[in-house]
């Protein structure tokens, strides 16, 4: 079946009142970026839904991209028909023959924005229902919870028919909730936290700490590839690489073993806050889950958060590890996350870190190092790269990865 357009129904936009138009405008921009590889499309955002005219572009490929755009409740591939009931009958029958298995229940649901059309919604429902009952007597009309709905939209230019409704990504259009920094490690949790941030409309930038020669180029490439895994939801994400070797060596030399992780995390948070403020970010996201590791007890979080007044948001804080893994598998980051490349969070990890560090002790040990100088030098070495979904960073590591797995 050759579809004419895809009809998009908005998600939570219906609750946004006076800001609705701004939300629709942002969604329109996000959809346009997501579908930029299909130049013949015409995208028409309306108050209650969006119409994407295919103009010959492949509907399956367009819908695959569309399914990853946040702010969409669902969408339907539709066929445009002239406002001639004989032609509407013919296309409706063809559509049902191709999509409705024998013996299922269905109903006709008509919406009419063209009130000059001869048939109102009830008359249209009855007309098409009678015709289909005559031509497909195996189908059962059922008004409540049918197996299939034949949706009909009567508009000025044509009548649109559809039988499929495909679930969208939900959430809010990315960018409508502001911009934030995400502390991205190479693990399972932080990409999932990034996914949830995007779903709530937050435009994220990745902050990743890199400690050569203790961490490898493969580890850096892995973090960039994890970023690329999330870009289909937004179009592009900035990856901010922060050199962290000198800081880790200084902490290792001057801070007692039990407080290494706490002070290291405090410096990471200080640097992330500084970068976020420079770039106009409103909050910091991370992948911490309460009690999962020593640095993620409430006492550790309190001692680490002490260095910032910026909001710290933890989308996976109350999730079990199995729940986080299931979400990582769903968004296709899990296999990449478990590749065994060391990140800077693990290379100097003490065997027995404090699970209940004291904030005053963390401050004291931190005072033993030149925080200002270390931060200045790290910030001077920051590298920023724009990452898109088509970018590949792991190709050069294929043989190594295959051997490791």
UniProtKB/Swiss-Prot annotation:
Enzyme Commission code(s) on record: 2.8.1.4
Keywords from the named record: ATP-binding, Cytoplasm, Nucleotide-binding, RNA-binding, Thiamine biosynthesis, Transferase, tRNA-binding
Enzyme superclass (EC): transferase
Residues binding ATP, per UniProt: 183-184, 208-209, 265, 287, 296
Localization terms from the record: Cytoplasm
GO molecular function (one): tRNA-uracil-4 sulfurtransferase activity
InterPro entries tied to this protein: Rossmann-like_a/b/a_fold, ThiI_AANH, ThiI_fer, ThiI_N, THUMP_dom, THUMP_ThiI, tRNA_STrfase, tRNA_sulfurtransferase_ThiI
Domain THUMP: 60-165
Catalyzed reactions per annotation: [ThiI sulfur-carrier protein]-S-sulfanyl-L-cysteine + a uridine in tRNA + 2 reduced [2Fe-2S]-[ferredoxin] + ATP + H(+) = [ThiI sulfur-carrier protein]-L-cysteine + a 4-thiouridine in tRNA + 2 oxidized [2Fe-2S]-[ferredoxin] + AMP + diphosphate; [ThiS sulfur-carrier protein]-C-terminal Gly-Gly-AMP + S-sulfanyl-L-cysteinyl-[cysteine desulfurase] + AH2 = [ThiS sulfur-carrier protein]-C-terminal-Gly-aminoethanethioate + L-cysteinyl-[cysteine desulfurase] + A + AMP + 2 H(+)
Pathway(s) served: Cofactor biosynthesis; thiamine diphosphate biosynthesis
Chain's role: Catalyzes the ATP-dependent transfer of a sulfur to tRNA to produce 4-thiouridine in position 8 of tRNAs, which functions as a near-UV photosensor. Also catalyzes the transfer of sulfur to the sulfur carrier protein ThiS, forming ThiS-thiocarboxylate. This is a step in the synthesis of thiazole, in the thiamine biosynthesis pathway. The sulfur is donated as persulfide by IscS.
Family according to the record: Belongs to the ThiI family.
Protein name, per record: Probable tRNA sulfurtransferase
């Amino acid at each position: 079946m050759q579809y004419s357009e895809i009809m998009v129904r908005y998600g939570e936009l219906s609750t946004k009142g006076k800001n609705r138009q701004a939300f629709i405008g942002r969604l329109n921009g996000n959809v346009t970026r997501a579908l930029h590889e299909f130049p013949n499309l015409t995208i028409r955002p309306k108050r209650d839904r969006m119409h994407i005219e295919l103009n010959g572009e492949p509907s399956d490929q367009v819908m695959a991209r569309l399914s990853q755009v946040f702010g969409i409740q669902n969408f339907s591939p539709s066929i445009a028909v002239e406002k001639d009931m004989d032609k509407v009958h013919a296309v409706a029958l063809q559509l049902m023959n191709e999509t409705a298995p024998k013996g299922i229940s269905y109903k006709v649901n008509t919406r009419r924005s063209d009130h000059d059309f001869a048939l109102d919604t009830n008359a249209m429902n009855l007309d098409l229902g009678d015709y289909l009952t005559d031509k497909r007597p195996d189908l059962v009309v059922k008004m409540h919870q049918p197996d299939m709905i034949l949706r009909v939209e009567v508009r000025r230019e044509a009548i649109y028919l559809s039988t499929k409704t495909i679930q969208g990504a939900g959430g809010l259009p990315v960018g409508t909730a502001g911009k934030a920094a995400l502390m991205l490690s190479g693990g399972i949790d932080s990409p999932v936290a990034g996914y949830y941030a995007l779903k709530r409309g937050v435009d994220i930038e990745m902050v990743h700490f890199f400690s050569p020669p203790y961490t490898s180029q493969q580890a850096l490439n892995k973090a960039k590839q994890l970023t690329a895994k999330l870009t289909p939801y937004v179009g592009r994400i900035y990856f901010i690489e922060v050199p962290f070797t000198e800081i880790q060596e200084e902490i290792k030399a001057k801070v007692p073993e039990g407080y290494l992780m706490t002070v290291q995390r405090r410096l990471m948070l200080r640097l992330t806050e500084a970068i976020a403020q420079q770039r106009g970010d409103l909050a910091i996201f991370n992948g911490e889950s309460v009690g999962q590791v020593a640095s993620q007890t409430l006492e550790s979080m309190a001692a680490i958060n002490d260095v910032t007044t910026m909001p710290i948001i933890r989308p996976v804080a109350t999730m079990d590890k199995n729940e986080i893994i299931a979400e990582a598998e769903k968004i296709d980051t899990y296999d990449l996350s478990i590749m065994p490349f060391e990140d800077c969070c693990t290379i100097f990890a003490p065997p027995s870190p404090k699970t209940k560090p004291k904030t005053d002790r963390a401050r004291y040990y931190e005072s033993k190092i030149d925080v200002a100088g270390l931060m200045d030098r790290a910030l001077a070495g920051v590298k920023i790269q724009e990452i898109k979904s088509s970018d590949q960073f792991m190709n050069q590591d294929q043989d190594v990865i295959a051997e490791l797995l």
